[in-house]
Amino acid sequence: MLKINKRFLIALLTFTLPFGCVGCSDGGSATYEQISGAEAKALMDSESGYIIIDARTQEEYDEGHIPRAILIPEYEIADRAEKELPDKDQLILVYCRSGRRSKIAAEELVKLGYTNVKEFGGIIDGEYEIVK
């Protein structure tokens, strides 16, 4: 009788442990990295192959934006990202006015499969060159 119980226990563990481990993993849930304005500025100064996304409205963008920034309002990210941002591994820096919309945009980019997204808050928080 003891041998049957051992065999049953071994079979049970053999089939249940792999499923238990899968349930404990994070599933590879990707996320964006939140960085400071100073860190973003340093990346802009030292890197060349990056894209800057301005997640504000057209009117805000026209009032002044960071050089090289592409306007994609946060509510249009899902519709426009794949067409305008074909390289999902490229460094993407995201900002808005105060940081709320840039977080939403960064989260959406990650959901779409972008792997190198850094959100640096609002344009009002840093000392960036502004162009019109």
Where are these regions (language model features)?
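Rhodanese-like catalytic fold shared by cysteine-dependent sulfurtransferases
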Residues: 2-9, 19-38, 43, 50, ...
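Residue-level signal for mature regions of secreted extracellular proteins and peptides
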Residues: 14-17
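Structural scaffold elements adjacent to functional motifs in cytosolic proteins
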Residues: 52-54
